[in-house]
A protein has these predicted regions:
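Mid-to-C-terminal secondary-structure elements
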Residues: 130-144, 155-267
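N-terminal Sec/SRP start-transfer signal
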Residues: 1-30
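Alpha-helical membrane-interface segments at transmembrane helix boundaries
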Residues: 9-13, 41-44, 48, 284-287
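Hydrophobic, regular-secondary-structure patches
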Residues: 41-123, 130-133, 148, 226-227, ...
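Juxtamembrane alpha-helical signal-transduction segment immediately C-terminal to a transmembrane helix
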Residues: 26, 36-39, 47
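Subset-of-secretome marker
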Residues: 76-78, 82-91, 103-107, 116-119, ...
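Peri-transmembrane interface segments
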Residues: 47, 238, 251, 264-287
Length: 287
């Protein structure tokens, strides 16, 4: 009788131990899955922030030829693409989830821009009055463009802090003259990005992915662009979304509105390898 009771208690105890071990294994397994998922989500968020930047939410819609941005340095403006009209501008700024929008022209590399004997190797932008607020810049030295300078073909230029470091030693850039394609432009201000976000760099590959190379940026009023470059060049659009997750939809809609103004018979059909069209730089998809 006692032996039966003892065996019964041993059986119950062994089952309980197995149950406890089973439960412990399940708990450990679930915890491991949660940890892995959390790590992956954290890594994805870090990559997203590295590519997009913290609190920026800007979508860049540019004119493309095939898979590459259209290069105005070596090509004339395509016949079927016109300057963005006031009506299209209003439609874009009124889009859902668009906080602000700016329209600009650019040269990604300048081969005939000098301060004294020093050549500038950065980018040139012809901007409107909304650009600095949309892109997240603030005046660090001097001043921004006056309202009249956006409309009266003023030969004024603003540098970013990187351009200042590349061109000047210790002297102030304010009041100095920059030669842009043979035309003298006076420096009226220096701007810097408001956001202090810095990407997390863990390797050399990360550095080139997130930072790249830059000789800085120069900005001139959009109306002054033809003084140094060409008349009636098509513009790009920089649209600021209300949040990061809205960026893909904003980029797609802005590109659709701008593409609707292109004469398709002049720039190729959909699917052509050299088709010219506006497209958004989808950093969120890349992330």
């Amino acid at each position: 009788m006692l032996e039966n009771i003892r065996l019964s208690l041993q059986g119950i105890l062994s089952h309980k131990v197995r149950s406890i071990l089973t439960m412990l294994g399940i708990i450990i397994g679930i915890a491991a899955i949660i940890a892995i998922v959390s790590t992956i989500k954290g890594t994805n968020e870090q990559i997203k922030n590295n590519l997009i930047g913290s609190g920026n939410n800007n979508v860049n819609v540019q004119l493309y030829q095939g898979e590459s941005p259209y290069d105005f340095s070596y090509q004339a403006a395509p016949d079927g693409v016109q300057v963005v009209s006031a009506e299209v501008r209003d439609q874009i700024t009124s889009l859902k989830n668009v906080e602000s929008a700016s329209f600009y022209r650019t040269r990604s590399y300048c081969d005939n821009v000098y301060y004294q004997n020093t050549q500038f190797s950065g980018s040139m932008y012809g901007i409107d009055a909304a650009y600095f607020d949309t892109a997240g810049y603030e005046v660090q030295q001097g001043r921004g463009f006056l309202s009249k300078e956006y409309t009266n073909n003023a030969k004024a230029v603003i540098l970013d802090s990187t351009a200042v470091k590349s061109l000047y030693s210790s002297e102030s850039p304010i009041g100095s003259v920059i030669d842009i394609n043979g035309e003298p432009f006076t420096v009226v201000g220096v701007v810097t990005e408001v956001s202090s976000f810095e990407p997390v760099i863990n390797s050399e590959e990360d550095y080139w992915t997130y930072m790249g190379t830059s000789g800085g940026k120069m900005f001139i009023p959009g109306q002054s662009w033809p003084i140094a470059y060409r008349y009636d060049e098509p513009e790009n659009c920089l649209a600021k979304a209300v949040d990061t997750d809205s960026m893909p939809a904003v980029g797609k809609k802005v590109a659709e509105l701008m593409n609707a103004t292109i004469r398709t018979n002049s720039v190729g059909k959909e699917g052509d390898s050299n088709q010219i069209k506006y497209d958004s730089q989808d950093l969120l998809k890349q992330a």
